[in-house]
Each structure stands twice: as C-alpha cells, then as structure tokens.
Design a protein with these regions (language model features):
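Membrane-proximal N-terminal amphipathic helix
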Residues: 40-66
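N-terminal leader/signal peptides at the extreme start of proteins
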Residues: 1-10
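Alpha-helical hydrophobic helix detector
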Residues: 16-32
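Short, surface-exposed interaction loops/tails
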Residues: 112-150
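Residue-level signal for short amphipathic helical patches enriched in basic/charged
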Residues: 7, 25-28, 40-43
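Extracellular/periplasmic head regions of type IV pilus-like filament subunits
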Residues: 61-119
Length: 150
C-alpha cells in the first residue's frame, strides 16, 4: 500500500510574505492615487479659469468693437459661451462639491470653487473701471486656498 500525502494550499510563511508585499504596495500606491486626484482637480480648475480668461478677452474685444471701449462683464461667467458644470448663482462662497460661484463680499468680487475633498479656492475678479479717462480693463487673480474658519 502506498502512503501519499498531498500538500495543497500555502504555508503560513508564504501567506505572511504575500500580506507584507501587499501592505508595502498599498503604502506606496495610496498617496500617489490621492496626489493624482488632487492634480486632476487642479487641472480641471485651470481649464475652467482659462476658459473664463479667454471669454473675458473676447468680451473685451466685442465691447471695444461696439462701444469703442474694452470692458469686462460684471459676472465673469457671463463671458462664457457655455455654462460651467456646477455653476450656481447663489452669490455665496461655494459650499457643495464641484460647485462654482461668483460672489461679492465686503467690496470684493470673487470666483469660488469647492473640490471633492471639501477644500475651497477663490480667484479675485475686478471688472475694471469704465468711466471717463480712467478706463481700465479688469483683472482675474490667481488661485488662493480658503482657510476654513475655526
């Protein structure tokens, strides 16, 4: 009579080694994944702001052609051919993921956007002065992170 033993499965050491390797891979992959999400959101914001800048230039050219004076609209989103996804007209700081707003507060006008991680960013907007000899086309500032109130 033959006595054969079959060994099916993995040893405890092999399973532990696999778990350690998976843990190392996860420790490296998760931060890279989170960085790629943040970079994607920043790129999407840059695309929207670039579209707004191009729309403002076109609006200034159109205004110059019709009125003889280059001017920007009061609301920069009105310079776009198509409405931005997530744009709302509630005149407050964006407070919903993916929301874009234009608002006036304390004498300042700003564009705001909230990302999926609940971080908020703003861009200062000045439509410029269109009166008398002091006429000047406006300005659109750089991205600034809004620090949450404590």
């Amino acid at each position: 009579m033959k006595n054969t033993t079959s060994q099916n499965g993995f040893t405890l050491i092999e399973l532990i080694i696999v778990m350690v390797i998976l843990g190392i891979m996860a420790a490296v992959a998760v931060p890279r994944y989170l960085d790629s999400i943040e970079n994607a959101e920043a790129s999407a914001e840059d695309a929207v702001i670039s579209s707004i800048r191009a729309g403002l230039k076109q609006a200034a050219n159109d205004s110059l052609y019709t009125n003889g004076r280059a001017s920007w609209p009061t609301n920069p989103f009105h310079a776009l051919a198509e409405e931005v996804a997530g744009y709302t007209t509630n005149n407050t700081l964006a407070d919903v993921d993916g929301e874009w707003t234009f608002f006036s507060a304390e004498g300042q006008t700003k564009i705001s956007h909230q990302r999926a991680d609940n971080s908020r960013y703003t861009w200062d907007y000045d439509e410029g002065t269109q009166v008398g000899d002091a006429a000047a086309v406006g300005a659109l500032g750089e991205r600034v992170m809004v620090t949450p109130a404590p």
